[in-house]
């Protein structure tokens, strides 16, 4: 099978690692719109345009299914899903599923980008959950820039904003998952919620006899960025530079 995975940047690499680990013998296409990253500080109109261009491109690549690893991109998928021939799975829907199943009537902190928060999709899709939203857009930017010192400081800053009575924390941007251990080490008394396991479980995938193939598609070729991908990705890949 040919599986597409999309993200505004490197955030989806954590999910990609987990999927390949579970189903190694498939063909994977990871499209990273690093020309326009970060999405979380853009307007809805800008991001919707980027997403439509990406989905149209993937239609031509004849993928069998698409996984939207980016929470901000996920916010636009409900109205776009029916326009394409391939099924679309979003990380946001699986985060919501876990919240609704396990945390009704609880207080939960969601750290997410500005646009994800402004979309109000987590409010719209969750039931009877008291959500504290914390804007982590700056952290997304720092992770893309690979500034480890400032990343650590910003994680500390975000954790200080979490209300003490929150039972759980959802890292509502896949970039933050790359530094989940940093969050846990600084906030070990909280439960960390994530829907990636359920998403992977639901995928209609199996392991074929052929070896896996992984291709990374960048919208801006950059040697330093390729090095950043190698830092977070556990598998060898072929790189492509594309224009959408």
Task: Please give the residue ranges for each predicted region.
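Non-catalytic structural scaffold of enzyme domains
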Residues: 1-244
């Amino acid at each position: 099978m040919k599986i597409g995975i999309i993200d505004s940047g490197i955030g989806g690499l954590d999910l990609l690692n987990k999927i390949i680990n579970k189903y190694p013998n498939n063909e994977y296409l990871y499209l990273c719109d690093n020309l326009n990253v970060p999405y979380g500080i853009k307007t809805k109109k800008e991001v919707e345009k980027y997403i439509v261009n990406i989905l149209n491109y993937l239609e031509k690549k004849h993928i069998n299914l698409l996984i939207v690893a980016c929470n901000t991109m996920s916010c636009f998928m409900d109205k776009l899903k029916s326009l394409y021939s391939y099924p679309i799975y979003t990380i946001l829907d699986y985060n919501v599923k876990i919240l609704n199943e396990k945390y009704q009537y609880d207080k939960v902190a969601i750290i997410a980008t500005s646009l994800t928060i402004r979309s109000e999709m987590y409010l719209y899709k969750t039931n009877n959950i008291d959500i504290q939203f914390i804007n982590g857009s700056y952290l997304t930017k720092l992770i893309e820039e690979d500034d480890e010192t400032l990343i650590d400081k910003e994680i500390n800053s975000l954790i200080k904003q979490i209300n003490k009575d929150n039972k759980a924390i959802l890292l509502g941007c896949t970039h933050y998952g790359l530094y989940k251990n940093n969050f846990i080490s600084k906030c070990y008394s909280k439960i960390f919620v994530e829907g990636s396991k359920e998403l992977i479980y639901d995928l209609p995938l199996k392991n074929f006899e052929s070896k896996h193939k992984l291709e990374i598609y960048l919208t801006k070729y950059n040697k330093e960025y390729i090095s950043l991908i190698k830092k977070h990705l556990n598998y060898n890949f072929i790189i492509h530079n594309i224009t959408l």
